[in-house]
């Protein structure tokens, strides 16, 4: 259960993505539950490139696609900020940009102390 007597903490993480490979962009730490509030993927390539975004649920060992093969236009971005995704300890987000692309990702989360959650 989340401990509401302790303040939550905010964190942003940025990563230069490796093209053609799954890149872990954020992992929820032990003893925390994280609310993903913002996710940016920026295409810095002169051509349109695809991106795949996955959520890995460690409690079930399953992977769920959030975005599968979405085309990000040249010098454009994909932004998620109209809803939340809740990650438990050990859950992580990965982004796989198309081979030959140059992309960056930024994730902003609010982390809540939750001593009951561990990997």
Per-range role (PLM):
Residues 1-34, 96-119:
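C-terminal interaction-tip segments
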Residues 32-38, 88-89:
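Short, solvent-exposed loop/turn segments enriched in Ser/Thr/Gly
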Residues 37, 47-51, 101-105:
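Short beta-strand/loop motifs in extracellular/secreted proteins, especially
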Residues 41-46, 98:
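Short solvent-exposed strand-capping/beta-turn motif centered on an Asx-Ser/Thr pair
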Residues 46-69:
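Short, surface-exposed beta-strand/strand-loop-strand elements in extracellular ectodomains
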Residues 70-77:
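Short proline/glycine- and polar residue-rich coil/turn motifs
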Residues 77-83:
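Exposed aromatic-hydrophobic patches
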Residues 84-99:
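Noncatalytic modules at the cell exterior or secretory-pathway interfaces
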